[in-house]
Amino acid sequence: MCYTVFLETNRGAKYMKLTHKHTLAASYLGYITQAVVNNLTPLLFVVFETSLGISIGRISLLITVNFGVQMLVDLLSAKWINVIGTRRAIVAAHAFAAAGLVALGVLPYRTADPYVGVLCAVCLCAVGGGITEVLISPIVEALPSEDKAGSMSLLHAFYCWGHVGVVVLSTLYFALAGTGRWALLPVLWAVLPLCNMVLFARVPLCKLAGDEHHTPLRALLKSKMIWLFLLMMVCA
């Protein structure tokens, strides 16, 4: 099924059909958004120390908070995503990501302690990143395709390309504008999740076969393998 979006132009009314190809493109952009929220803040660690006077110890805590919030969201999302629906959840994920990026550029200069502003922004980004991590792969897996394995491989490659893009484009921004204007950078990056949020609100989504059956959270917490994987990620 395709969704039809009505577009009003100066030359008259036109219709654009959104198909599963647009859903796949939105998913690829979703993983680029994931790369932005995970990798932009570490690029600013030196700026946080020199411009905001935040100590290295407090900066390193941001990494732990980001990881912890994302893991918590991953655990809780299995239950409440079924309640609000996939579309609302993925739209909310991009809204959190955009809000976190904007907050990263604004809140440090609006709070008594700049660290509090940065911490709030990191938490918002982590919520968006956690939901995105849970949903994007199932969304792509549910799409009708003759090459699901290829689509999934390409999907995860987009995170790597997004990481490279964040580093290269952010470095180019600093070279042209200087680190003194760092606060504008995350606001500019927020355009990506905002645009993709609108796209996900309109593209067709498919229901994954058998997605009504889920392992209860309590059963997951009792699994020794789950705790082993968590320990490995923390150590990494």
Region spans (language model):
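Juxtamembrane intracellular "pre-TM" segments in multi-pass secondary transporters
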Residues: 12, 16-18, 207-230
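C-terminal ends and interior cores of transmembrane alpha-helices
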Residues: 95-112
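Helix-loop-helix hairpin linking two adjacent transmembrane segments in secondary transporters
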Residues: 146-147, 154-205
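Cytoplasmic helix-loop-helix junction between adjacent transmembrane helices
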Residues: 121-157
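Central cavity-lining transmembrane alpha-helices of secondary-active solute carriers
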Residues: 61-79
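Short hydrophobic/small-residue motifs within alpha-helical transmembrane segments
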Residues: 67-68, 160-161, 233
